[in-house]
Amino acid sequence: MKKILILGSTGSIGTNALELIRNNREQYQVVGISGNKNIDLLKKQIEEFKPISIYVGSEQDAIYLKKEYSFIKEVYFGENGLAELSKNSDYDIILTAVSGAIGIDATVEAIKRGKRIALANKETMVSAGVYINKLLKEYPKAEIVPVDSEHSALFQSLQGFKKENLKKLIITASGGTFRGKDLAYLENVTVEQALKHPNWSMGKKITIDSSTLVNKGLEVIEAHELFNVDYDDIEVVIHPQSVIHSMVEYVDGSIIAQMGVANMKTPILYAFTYPEKEYNSSINFLDLIKNNNLTFEEADRKVLKGIDLAYRAGRTGDTMPTVFNASNEIAVELFMKKQIKFLDIYRIIEEAMNSHQVLTLNTDNALNVIKEVDREIRKKVREQWEK
């Protein structure tokens, strides 16, 4: 039986993971979960799966839950709580499904313990990829299996081939909510419009990121760090049907693609079972006859600038990807609060990147540098844009 620790159990990926486990309880045991503010759902999960360790955002909620459930041995909260949960819990696999830079420390602790990380937190590799890769070399028993559908597709399509056989990675994108729209249209789009993704059911933040194509930009940086592939050999292609989740082109002209329904359960399950594949009754199967029209097109990077900003951040390297990520996180938060317009998201990211003096990350102090830059950028954006 595999012991699973789920960070972000109340979010979209976390709830999908728990549904997979619910349908295969003889194979998996949930030893720990974490939620932030959705206490009602967290309580239901605690009652059903009976984890012995949990994390919650506030001290008040932590005290309440510890009193409420006698079987819980440890309750963590606060800024360092997720890392402590990762450091102290007894698990085989940790699913990092929290959004934001808070997931980095928890991943670091899991690597130091030689665990498998089912990675669904983009920021870990975007902001701290250089440091994480260095750490993985120091702790070779640890492994990262990506959960993001595109990176899972690339990971699967790369199995069994040498890196010198590779020509390029092709990351597919649905195009998001505003595919085909012009700048005049985007100037006044609402939060409600941006949250209507055509294919995927996801959390609010990642849905907004998909509408700006910043999400795809983050995926480009993450792919560079995960697979050690140059940015010139990573391509983004719009694929509106979201059936092909990504592809790998090889030097002999062949392209290997991973296909499936637009659902996060398959990549989550693969991260749990790798290198094997396992049936689960909650998985839906792709009907090729019904999905017989697969199309591809170029992304309109002049209108939806998230991809180009990411390539710029990634090629600059060092602390610039952290700036890209942190400024976007605050910009999306302000947009969802209706304090800025949709196109202001790009303006905020560009301003933050243009004004940043890049710091190198080739020292043992890299993680502290990343955290400090992350804090500074968030503070600066809030001061300039928050109403």
Swiss-Prot record:
Its EC number is 1.1.1.267. Its cofactor is Mg(2+); Mn(2+). NADPH binds at T10, G11, S12, I13, K37, N38, N121, E123, G203. It catalyses: 2-C-methyl-D-erythritol 4-phosphate + NADP(+) = 1-deoxy-D-xylulose 5-phosphate + NADPH + H(+). The keyword Oxidoreductase applies. Keywords: Isoprene biosynthesis, Manganese, Metal-binding, NADP, Oxidoreductase. Pfam families: DXP_redisom_C, DXP_reductoisom, DXPR_C. GO terms for molecular function: 1-deoxy-D-xylulose-5-phosphate reductoisomerase activity; manganese ion binding; NADPH binding. Mn(2+) binds at D148, E150, E219. GO terms for biological process: isopentenyl diphosphate biosynthetic process, methylerythritol 4-phosphate pathway involved in terpenoid biosynthetic process. 1-deoxy-D-xylulose 5-phosphate binds at K122, S149, E150, S174, H197, S210, N215, K216, E219. Pathway: Isoprenoid biosynthesis; isopentenyl diphosphate biosynthesis via DXP pathway; isopentenyl diphosphate from 1-deoxy-D-xylulose 5-phosphate: step 1/6. It is an enzyme of class 1 (oxidoreductase). Belongs to the DXR family. PANTHER family: 1-DEOXY-D-XYLULOSE 5-PHOSPHATE REDUCTOISOMERASE, 1-DEOXY-D-XYLULOSE 5-PHOSPHATE REDUCTOISOMERASE, CHLOROPLASTIC. HAMAP family: DXP_reductoisom (MF_00183). Catalyzes the NADPH-dependent rearrangement and reduction of 1-deoxy-D-xylulose-5-phosphate (DXP) to 2-C-methyl-D-erythritol 4-phosphate (MEP). This is 1-deoxy-D-xylulose 5-phosphate reductoisomerase. The gene is dxr.
